[in-house]
Design a protein with these regions (language model features):
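RNA-contacting regions in translation and RNA-metabolism proteins
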Residues: 1-161
């Protein structure tokens, strides 16, 4: 299967249609908006009582929905493209919260001079934390653990010898 970086108009229409069909099957009445096309990012709007159900714990249901949309669209279009599914800007807010958390914990590490391990999180969230602190002169980050228990440890950088 060929990788497509910028989807065609038809690819976008197919993707929106697939997501709308899945939402109808889930009995969720909402609208789907295209936020960007590189990568193709769809945002689900107008969700009322089912928002928590759609997002799931730490975005797990939303990630599963995204995987399902990627698989169906890939099968229909016969090529691969990166599709991101968001709900009421949850992913955007989560990213901002993770950056803020990384900065707060880095300050605690500086104050208490001890490493702090964050909660277990999926790879894309750990990456956000690593990137948020990458330019820090005195802080380092490291992912530890296995599988779903993988977490980021934030520490003071060791002085060069």
């Amino acid at each position: 299967m060929q990788e497509v970086t910028v989807p065609s108009r038809e690819d976008v229409e197919i993707t929106v249609d697939v997501l709308q069909h899945i939402l109808r099957y889930m009995n969720i009445h909402a609208t789907v908006q295209v936020r960007s096309t590189n990568p193709l990012t769809l945002n689900i709007h107008g969700i009322n009582e089912n928002l928590g159900l759609l997002i799931g714990r730490r975005g797990e249901t939303l990630s599963s929905l995204q995987l399902l949309v990627n698989l169906i669209v890939g099968h229909r279009t016969r090529h691969r493209m990166r599709i991101i599914v968001d709900a009421e800007n949850y992913r955007q807010r989560r990213e901002e919260n993770l950056r803020s958390l990384a900065q707060r914990v880095a300050q605690q590490v500086r104050n208490y001079r001890r490493s702090i391990a964050l909660e277990a999180m999926p790879p894309h969230e750990r990456r956000i934390v690593h990137i948020a602190l990458a330019d820090s002169k005195d802080i380092s980050t490291e992912s530890i653990g296995e599988g779903d228990a993988r977490r980021v440890v934030i520490s003071l950088k060791r002085p060069a010898r």
